[in-house]
């Protein structure tokens, strides 16, 4: 490894990269860490981080929505299937210290949010190919929208039925 490389690792299932970076930076950009944790479906971790920011419920819900949208935009077989190329999205986000300002100012957020909601509706319209109290299996069509929504859909299934395994 490079002599300047410093590794930060936490194997806890309740810790994501955003939480590790937040810890390393001493919470300087904690609102972005909240967004990242929500995007990774670590709602309890995100909520704990958000409590340190003294945010109201509406603000926390907005950070959750942004995290889910950014996560949704990361799914696809190739960057061509994404709504916004990751480099372009990073370029747009980089100018904002606060995620709420990004969400309010950048029309790309509304574009991603609208597409995610449309795709979630399509995914929820599908019946599982097999389901019981312990497991539910969903087969999504071979289409870009279904690859984009697979993570968001799986996360929602897991949140709605935490005692049941889900295959998407």
Residues covered by each model-derived region:
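Gly/His-enriched, cation/cofactor- and phosphate-binding structural elements
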Residues: 91-168
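Accessory alpha-helical/coil subdomains and C-terminal extensions
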Residues: 45-125
């Amino acid at each position: 490894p490079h002599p300047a490389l410093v590794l930060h690792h936490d194997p806890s299932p309740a810790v994501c990269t955003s939480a590790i970076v937040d810890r390393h930076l001493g919470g300087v950009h904690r609102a972005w860490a909240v967004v990242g944790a929500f995007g990774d479906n670590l709602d309890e971790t995100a909520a704990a981080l958000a409590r340190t920011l003294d945010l109201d419920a509406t603000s926390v819900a907005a950070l959750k929505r942004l995290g889910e949208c950014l996560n949704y935009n990361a799914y696809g077989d190739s960057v061509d299937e994404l709504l916004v190329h990751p480099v372009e999205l990073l370029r747009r986000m980089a100018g904002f210290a606060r995620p709420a300002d990004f969400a309010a100012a950048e029309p790309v957020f509304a574009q991603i949010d609208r597409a995610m909601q449309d795709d979630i509706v399509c995914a929820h319209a599908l019946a599982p190919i097999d389901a019981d109290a312990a497991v539910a299996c969903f087969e999504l069509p071979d289409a870009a929208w279904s690859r984009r929504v697979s993570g968001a859909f799986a996360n929602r299934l897991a949140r709605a039925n935490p005692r049941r395994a889900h295959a998407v």
